């Protein structure tokens, strides 16, 4: 009789262990799926920065994915600060001419374009009409 009680207890313990393991695995799977869907739903922002852009404007948009700076900005006082806001150096693209941005916009999944009044935006507006534009003045 004692043997069958131990056997039942061992089976119950094993069942609880398996149930707990499955729960933890399922919970991790759900968390991973939520993280993936959150990253997919996160807005992709391209920020055009030049020498007239204030540091406050750069900070305001620093949580987003992409900065695009003119060469003059990279040679200015903003250089180290701008790069410190970018989570990875590959996310800081360098460009001299706003028109050449069109190539990037056509190949990247960008939802919002933020630019400074110094940059001409008419060609960008006409060729990339699916974007939300935010003018920083």
UniProtKB/Swiss-Prot annotation:
Species of provenance: Schizosaccharomyces pombe (strain 972 / ATCC 24843)
Protein name in UniProt: Uncharacterized protein C57A7.15c
Domain of life, source organism: Eukaryota
Cellular component per GO, a single term: peroxisomal membrane
Any one Gene Ontology BP term: protein import into peroxisome matrix, receptor recycling
GO molecular function: ubiquitin-protein transferase activator activity
């Amino acid at each position: 009789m004692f043997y069958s009680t131990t056997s039942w207890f061992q089976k119950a313990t094993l069942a609880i262990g398996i149930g707990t393991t499955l729960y933890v695995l399922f919970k991790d799977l759900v968390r991973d799926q939520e993280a993936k869907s959150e990253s997919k739903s996160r807005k992709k922002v391209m920020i055009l920065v030049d020498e007239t852009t204030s540091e406050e404007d750069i900070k305001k948009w620093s949580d987003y994915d992409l900065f695009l700076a003119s060469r003059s900005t990279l040679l200015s006082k903003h250089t180290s600060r701008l790069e410190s806001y970018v989570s990875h150096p590959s996310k800081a693209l360098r460009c001299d001419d706003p028109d050449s941005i069109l190539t990037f916009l056509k190949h990247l999944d960008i939802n919002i374009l933020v630019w400074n009044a110094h940059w001409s935006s008419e060609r960008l507006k006409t060729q990339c009409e699916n974007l939300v534009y935010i003018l920083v003045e």
